[in-house]
Amino acid sequence: MSVKWEKQEGNEGVLTVEVDADTFKTALDDAFKKVVKQVSIPGFRKGKVPRGLFEQRFGVEALYQDALDILLPVEYPKAVEEAGIEPVDRPEIDVEKIEKGESLIFTAKVTVKPEVKLGDYKGLGIEKDDTAVTDEDVQNELKALQERQAELVVKEEGAVENGDTVVLDFEGFVDGEAFEGGKAENYSLEVGSGSFIPGFEEQLTGLEAGAEKDVEVTFPEEYHAEELAGKPAVFKVKIHEIKAKELPELNDEFAKDIDEEVETLAELTEKTKKRLEEAKENEADAKLREELVLKASENAEADVPQAMIDTELDRMLKEFEQRLQMQGMNLELYTQFSGQDENALKEQMKEDAAKRVKSNLTLEAIAQAENLEVTDEEVEAELTKMAEAYNMPVENIKQAIGSTDAMKEDLKVRKAIDFLVENR
């Protein structure tokens, strides 16, 4: 095999590959063995047609495509390795010369990973946020725990207040006409939750059980139902019942109900403080790492290929789908509800995708510049951590992953971020 790499404009180039005649002959032989199984010629059983007769009847050209299908998946990666390039998308392959008894020549137009010119990435001067937890933070968290344990109690008298839950009937009208999805009976709504159209919930405050009211609102311009977006509407509302939150008393009994590992409110308070400190520490660490990576990336120069952005967009969309599934939704339902199709979602994600790709390229370049390497022991430690997380034997994890090359790259990128933190 002979390989020639010609760099063109931007990150594109052409790989010219010549495969020797013997290798091409072997591919033609294998192609014939495959094709002949499907060929019937009078006087011969299927699969038993002689090669000479086959080529006489159909021409050797009938084997070329199958030979290429056998050859290219093997020879193209070899050529890429020999040329020392890193393609980031599928190649556009053209066959320049194909003839029995001769060498095969093909070209592959590819987009390769760009070179990164690093700017400043040490001494960036970014400080970690303060992680101190105040008594007020702890009290607010305990109050939130109280809120989550609150019971709804029917108000025998009095009007709707912010935070109350009302049971109501409503029917909406636009231009005097009822619209689909605008009617409900005995609907429970927490006033102040922001669940309804802006302005709706505020107009319920001050009403008493049994009250009826015309609530006038305007649908937001970006409302998911286009036929309603930006239009004024009137909702005829009837209040059946008002429920107020009744908070449990903040005492030792409350503490034991919340956490069976504590006996007193003082213990719960201390445990809550430690949990908040840990959460703040993790949040500050994550923010610091993110800001350092972003700054180093902004200081670097790289012509990011669209192919890499498109790949990242696809990955981000899959991540988004997985999050939706965890919430009991899917992408189709989401697009119906939000009024956005897949292309609109990708358009929203495009800027973040480009930043992610450039950040990753920058971190790879930093790892190379600082000679950061990942040892076999570090890979084993990561595999062990995964095995513990999934409660599986390490060998099963290894079989599922196959090659650890991607894991090594991820660990190397992580080391580059650690380097930024240590040298900020």
Swiss-Prot record:
Q: Which GO terms of type biological process are on file?
A: 'de novo' cotranslational protein folding; cell division; chaperone-mediated protein folding; protein transport; protein unfolding
Q: Which cysteines are joined by disulfide bonds?
A: none
**The UniProt record lists the keyword Glycoprotein:** no
Using the record's annotation, list all stretches that form the PPIase FKBP-type domain.
163-248
Q: Which reaction does it catalyse?
A: [protein]-peptidylproline (omega=180) = [protein]-peptidylproline (omega=0)
Keyword tags: Cell cycle, Cell division, Chaperone, Cytoplasm, Isomerase, Rotamase
Compartment annotation: Cytoplasm
What does the UniProt entry state concerning the protein's domains?
Answer: Consists of 3 domains; the N-terminus binds the ribosome, the middle domain has PPIase activity, while the C-terminus has intrinsic chaperone activity on its own.
Main role?
Involved in protein export. Acts as a chaperone by maintaining the newly synthesized protein in an open conformation. Functions as a peptidyl-prolyl cis-trans isomerase.
Output this protein's name: Trigger factor
Task: Report the source organism.
Answer: Bacillus velezensis (strain DSM 23117 / BGSC 10A6 / LMG 26770 / FZB42) (Bacillus amyloliquefaciens subsp. plantarum)
